[in-house]
Amino acid sequence: MKLKKAMLLFAAAAVAAGTVAGCSGSAKETTAASVAETNAEETKEETTAEETKEEETAAEEEDEENYDTGDAALDNTRNQDEIGEKELLVVSFGTSYNDSRRLTVGAIENAIENAFPDYSVRRGFTSQIIIDHVKKRDNVSIDNVTEALNRAVDNGVKTLVVQPTHLMNGLEYTDLVNELAENSDAFEHVAVGEPLLTSDDDFKAVISAITDATKEYDDGETAICFMGHGTEADSNAVYQKMQDMLKEEGFDNYYVGTVEATPSLDDV
């Protein structure tokens, strides 16, 4: 009797264990199914987000392609041969806006050409993205720095003067100086100018220029803001220095900010 009772208890325990195991298995299967479903939903959301981003990027590129930036043919790319023995290479970051390129970079190049008539003035851009964009959109070729230097060598230039239009002694300027050093043996004489904001006198000259150009707006009630791009390099300090020097000279309604660094737009 005791043996029969024990066997019944064992059988009951086995059934219970099997039932528990079955429930546990069902729970595991349910959990696995839920995880798989969640992962599928997340993957779908990520794919949708990527597709949306690609569509937005394509739309932005299409808008930019359709935006009229002016006639590219009016801009002198200054990548002609027959340079002569003396060249003045003007190096700029660059812009893909045709009218802006002609009225800013082009105007500087023209002014330099008038000031130094004994030199052939040529152009070099440091932004390959801009060079490629202009080429693709307008079929206009602009030399990068390497191409400009190679062109100078091929044309037998002996005296090369390089003047950047960069604002500060930052990463772009450092790269330029390094590339010139690597190619200096190709010329008899090489010289490179400094960025716009190098000495205190440079800051004072720029302050004089920008405040004179905007003095009609300095009525005591209008905030006059100048925005720069900004950089992670230490050279970004030029923006705060410009702000401080403006205040020191009594231009309390003048503000300096950057798009991607400090002073930020919120600071302004």
Q: What feature does the model see in each segment?
A:
Residues 51, 55-268:
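Active-site-proximal alpha-helix that buttresses catalytic centers in soluble enzyme cores
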Residues 1-10:
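Bacterial Sec-dependent N-terminal signal peptides
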